[in-house]
């Protein structure tokens, strides 16, 4: 149950009544009418912009509309007051019984409270991580993996049919570099000195690949030229790297539904088919691009190339898809891959890219818009860098030196749950500081601890109540005398719980799972605030001498626990029941 939706329904019903009474003209579009929490809680429980958005189309002053609407709303038994503010905003206060009833609603709904059907079963593809299969996942990949997986969980929670997908970049030059690097480790496995020259991958993680190559091929490859072993070693090493990446993702609690290969697009006609589709729309042509300003991109050359008219769909310049020598640009297989996703029948596509792919956003959106005839929206989320800190100092990683911090390093030091939560404590496009010491601190400044501690406190109340012989099942607590929850701090906590369904829908519509982490921190803050006030005000403690009062307060605590567990589930974090 979304209380904000319920009150919005009331507002639109009263606007309809005003139309019938001749106070408003017929045919007004009410889609922009919103009901939301006011920016300042002192102004009320909810606020609506109805009068402001209807003033111009109705030809009436906003305050006049607001005053007439306020009179009607104040007559509803759920509304204790309706006050006009400023030029025509309408602030509403709800009666305590509405808030108190929310506790029973949450307990009766259980883990379905907050779940939504706004996705209406639409098929959405979330592509994320898609790291080059050239080594173990590093800390930069961790953030993209967590954001992508949490977004997938959020969308499923809100009613979408979600597919998690990993695009294996196994068609470019980097996998040849991997093969050459692995071959040196193969030589090393035979007692020869490896030649890790400039440009190769130096990491020790390739030593087991060399050993595995030795086990499979013996010394049969040692005296052969690169042209005889490159393809086999490339496929062998790529598969071993992908197995390592799958294990890394599993350690982070991420499981993909689909792995798609870039290599599978070459020589199969898929790239040609995608470009033929664009050609049918007169979006492919031969031409020479103007020299770019600033840094020259890899795909620019001062000769005639095959170009995609991406400017027809919002890009800044047209983009090369085939070079003058007849080879494909990096963009061509990406177009084909996204065309494949479109033809698989997805209603929406989401790509999670590293911030260094920012220049790819417009061209990729243009390609999908063209290939789907505007039917399939593509949202691209850019993931900013993670800055590591340890002992108060920046902790830098160097892939070239083979000493970068891996996903496993992070998970082994702080755990999967802490890693996942911390990666969602900033919006995806903001740089995130990851302090190995602070994320394990038991303090208010550590959001992971703060939220988990709230859940542990709730469970301690439930345990003590059981020890006193109380029935603390959700079904029984839902029948408590909830009128006893009348303190402003208790009502404020319930009001925060009432925001959960609305928060879920907003986060899902905007593809922003960090909103869930932010909300959980705010909810935990309300719970801790009430708990701490109970240290000075005995009447606010969750366990009271009067069993009737106790039952009501325990019901409130349990309702908070229901929502915290639901939110942590979306983040892929296991709730902690007890702090030791």
Curated annotation (Swiss-Prot):
Q: What is its main location?
A: cytoplasm
PROSITE patterns from the UniProt entry: AA_TRNA_LIGASE_I (PS00178)
Q: Which GO terms describe its cellular component?
A: cytoplasm
The record's keywords, sorted A to Z, are: Aminoacyl-tRNA synthetase, ATP-binding, Cytoplasm, Ligase, Nucleotide-binding, Protein biosynthesis
Catalysed reaction, written as an equation: tRNA(Arg) + L-arginine + ATP = L-arginyl-tRNA(Arg) + AMP + diphosphate
GO BP term (any one) = arginyl-tRNA aminoacylation
Question: Which domain of life does the protein's organism represent?
Answer: Bacteria
- What family, per the record? Belongs to the class-I aminoacyl-tRNA synthetase family.
What is the name of the protein in this document?
Answer: Arginine--tRNA ligase
């Amino acid at each position: 149950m979304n209380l904000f939706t319920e009150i919005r329904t009331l507002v639109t019903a009263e606007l309809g009544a005003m139309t019938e009474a001749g106070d408003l003209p017929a045919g007004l579009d009410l889609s922009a009418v919103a009901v939301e929490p006011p920016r300042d809680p002192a102004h009320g429980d909810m606020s609506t912009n109805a009068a402001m958005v209807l003033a111009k189309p109705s030809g009436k002053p906003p305050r006049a509309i607001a005053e007439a609407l306020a009179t009607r709303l104040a007559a509803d038994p759920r509304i204790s007051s309706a006050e006009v503010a400023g030029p025509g905003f309408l602030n509403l206060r709800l009666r305590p019984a509405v808030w108190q009833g929310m506790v029973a609603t949450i307990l009766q709904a259980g883990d379905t409270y907050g779940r939504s059907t706004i996705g209406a079963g639409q098929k959405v593809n979330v592509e994320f991580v898609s790291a080059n299969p050239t080594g173990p996942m590093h800390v930069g990949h961790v953030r993209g993996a967590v954001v992508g997986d949490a977004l997938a969980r959020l969308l499923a929670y809100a009613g979408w049919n979600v597919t998690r997908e990993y695009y294996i970049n196994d068609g470019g030059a980097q996998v040849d570099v991997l093969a050459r690097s692995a071959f040196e480790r193969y030589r090393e496995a035979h007692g020869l000195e490896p030649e890790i020259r400039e440009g190769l991958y130096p990491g020790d993680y390739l030593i087991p690949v060399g050993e595995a190559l030795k086990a499979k091929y013996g010394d049969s490859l040692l005296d052969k030229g690169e042209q005889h072993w490159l393809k086999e070693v490339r496929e062998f090493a790529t598969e071993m790297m992908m197995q390592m990446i799958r294990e890394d993702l599993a350690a982070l609690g991420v499981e993909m539904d689909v792995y798609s290969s870039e290599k599978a697009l070459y020589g199969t006609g898929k790239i040609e088919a995608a470009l033929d589709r664009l050609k049918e729309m007169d979006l492919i042509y031969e031409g020479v691009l103007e020299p770019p300003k600033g840094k020259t991109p890899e795909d620019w050359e001062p000769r005639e190339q095959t170009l995609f008219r991406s400017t027809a769909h919002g890009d800044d310049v047209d983009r090369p898809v085939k070079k003058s020598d007849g080879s494909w640009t990096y963009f061509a297989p990406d177009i084909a891959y996204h065309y494949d996703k479109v033809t698989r029948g997805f209603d929406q596509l989401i790509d999670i890219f590293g911030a260094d792919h920012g220049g790819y956003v417009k061209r990729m959106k243009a390609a999908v818009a063209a290939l789907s005839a505007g039917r399939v929206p593509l949202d691209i989320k850019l993931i900013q860098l993670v800055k590591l800190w340890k002992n108060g100092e920046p902790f830098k990683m160097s892939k070239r030196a083979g000493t970068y911090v891996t996903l496993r390093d992070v998970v082994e030091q702080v755990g999967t749950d802490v890693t996942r939560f911390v990666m969602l404590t900033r919006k995806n496009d903001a740089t995130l500081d990851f302090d190995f010491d602070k994320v394990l601190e038991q303090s208010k400044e550590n959001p992971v601890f703060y939220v988990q501690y709230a859940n542990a406190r709730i469970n301690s109340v439930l345990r003590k109540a059981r020890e006193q012989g109380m029935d603390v099942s959700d079904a029984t607590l839902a029948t408590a005398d909830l009128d006893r929850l009348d303190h402003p701090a208790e009502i404020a906590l319930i009001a925060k719980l009432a925001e959960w369904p609305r928060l879920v829908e907003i986060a899902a519509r905007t593809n922003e799972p960090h909103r869930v982490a932010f909300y959980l921190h705010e909810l935990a803050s309300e719970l801790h605030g009430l708990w701490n006030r109970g240290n000075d005000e005995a009447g606010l403690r969750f366990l009271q001498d009067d069993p009737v009062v106790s039952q009501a307060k325990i019901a409130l605590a349990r309702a908070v626990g229901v929502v915290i567990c639901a939110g942590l589930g979306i983040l892929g974090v296991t709730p902690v029941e007890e702090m030791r």
